[in-house]
Amino acid sequence: MMSSRTQDADGASIRFSDHTLDKATKAKVTLENYYSNLVTQYGERKQRLAKLEAQLKDESLSEAQRQEKRLQHAQKETEYLRLKRLRLGVEDFEALKVIGRGAFGEVRLVQKKDTGHVYAMKVLRKADMLEKEQVAHVRAERDVLVEADHQWVVKMYYSFQDPVNLYLIMEFLPGGDMMTLLMKKDTLSEEGTQFYISETALAIDSIHKLGFIHRDIKPDNLLLDARGHLKLSDFGLCTGLKKSHRTDFYRDLSQAKPSDFIGTCASLSCSPMDSKRRAESWKRNRRALAYSTVGTPDYIAPEVFLQTGYGPACDWWSLGVIMYEMLMGYPPFCSDNPQDTYRKVMNWRETLIFPPEIPISEEAKETIINFCCEADRRLGSQRGLEDLKSVPFFRGVDWEHIRERPAAIPVEVRSIDDTSNFDEFPDVSLEIPSAPIPQGGEIAKDWVFINYTYKRFEVRNLE
C-alpha cells in the first residue's frame, strides 16, 4: 500500500496510508461543498426574490395583491427545500426507449413515475469517467447546465448518482438533432442555412457571455425542439470523452509536413462526381462516427490541436464548418479517416475549397471563409454576435425575435413521447446499464463526484 509522510509538532515523521489520505480528502471536499452550497443557495434565493420584486413594480397591483404574491413565492421556496431533501433515484423513472448512444453512456427517453412527465435521461458510467480521466468534463457538463438557464441551452431538471452511474435528467427535445436533419436533406437552401446558423450563433454567444467555451459545436449537439428551433447540448462532455477530441490522439501526426498532404489535396479534383461521392460517403459513415470512441475532428478548430492555447473563437470556426456542410452536403475537411481530416484542418489555407458544381452566393462563401480563418481575425472573435450583425449574409435576420418566428423546416411531433426523429436501437436493452459495484480500494475516488446532485427550482412546478 502506498503512503505519504508528514511531520508532527516535534518534527517526528508520521506516515499516512493512501486510504487515510483519501478519507481525509473526501471529508475536506464534503465540508467545502456543504458551505459553498449554503452560500450559493442563499444567493439564488436572493436573486429569485429580487426578480419577483422587480416584476411587482411593473404590475399595477394593490399592496394586498403584492403581499399575496410574496406569500405564494415564500411557499414555493419552502416546497423547493422539501423537494431538495427527497432522494431521487433511477427507480423513480420508467425507461421508454433508448434514443442515443455514445462511447461511455446512453440516452433514454424516460417518464417520471409520480408525475408522468417525460424527460431525456443521460446515463454515464463512473468507472469509465475515472479510468479515462473525464471527471472534469462530466463536472463541466453538469455545472454549465445548472448555470446556463435560458432558451438556447437544453434545460437540465435533475442530476443524481448511484454507486455505478451518473444521471442527467434533461428536457426531451422531440425534433432530434441537426445531424439527423442534414442526413435527411442533400443540402439546405441559403435561407434555411441563414436561419439555423443564426440560431446557433445566438446560442454560442449566450454561453460565451457566461464565460464558457463549448469546444464541441457540431450538428450532433444542436438539438431541435417541437417547433424546430435550436438548443445547444453536451457541454464539455463530448469534448474529451472521445479520443478524437484529445490532442494526444493526433500528436504522432503533428510531424506531418504540409508537402506530404498537398499532393493528396491536388488529387481531390473537384469534378461533379467527386462532390457527389464525397457527400454520399460522408452520410454513409457519419452515423457510425457519431457513436464511436474515435469520432471525427471535422468541426474542431486548428488552434485546439496546437496546444498553444485557444479561446471562444474556436466555437466560431466550428460554426463555419457547419455552414459549409449545410450548403454543400458535407463538411469542408471530410476524409476517409480522422488522420487525413486532421491534416486537412491543419492545412486549411490549401484545403478549404468550394467546388464550382455546387453554386452558392458570394456572400455565403465569404461568410464561411471569415469563420474558417486565423483565430484573431475570425468572424465573432472580436465582438461576438455583434460581428455577425453587419455581415451581408445575415441581412434581414430578426435577432431579437427569431425564436418566436416559424422555423425554417417544421418539425412533425405526434405526441409528447414521439421519437420518430431519433435513431432506432432495437439491440439495446431498456434496462439501465450497470457494472459491478467497485470493491475495496476501487471506490476510494468516488469523492470526486461529491455535489453532483441537483434539482432545478422550476421543477417544483412540475411535481
Curated annotation (Swiss-Prot):
Activated by fry. It catalyses: L-seryl-[protein] + ATP = O-phospho-L-seryl-[protein] + ADP + H(+); L-threonyl-[protein] + ATP = O-phospho-L-threonyl-[protein] + ADP + H(+). GO terms for molecular function: ATP binding; metal ion binding; protein serine kinase activity; protein serine/threonine kinase activity. Signal peptide: none annotated. The active site is at 216 (proton acceptor). Gene3D superfamilies: Phosphorylase Kinase, domain 1, Transferase(Phosphotransferase) domain 1. PROSITE patterns: AGC_KINASE_CTER, PROTEIN_KINASE_ATP, PROTEIN_KINASE_DOM, PROTEIN_KINASE_ST. Its cofactor is Mg(2+). Its EC number is 2.7.11.1. It is an enzyme of class 2 (transferase). Transmembrane segments: none annotated. Pfam families: Pkinase, Pkinase_C. GO terms for cellular component: axon; cell body; cell cortex; cell hair; cell periphery; cytoplasm; dendrite; nucleus. Belongs to the protein kinase superfamily. AGC Ser/Thr protein kinase family. PANTHER family: CHROMOSOME UNDETERMINED SCAFFOLD_135, WHOLE GENOME SHOTGUN SEQUENCE, MYOTONIC DYSTROPHY S/T KINASE-RELATED. Serine/threonine-protein kinase involved in controlling cell structure and proliferation of a variety of polarized outgrowths including epidermal hairs, bristles, arista laterals, and dendrites. Together with fry, maintains the integrity of epidermal hairs and is an essential component of the signaling pathway regulating dendritic branching of sensory neurons. Reduces neurite outgrowth by phosphorylating pav, thereby inhibiting its function in microtubule-microtubule sliding. Interacts with, and is activated by, Mob1. This is Serine/threonine-protein kinase tricornered.
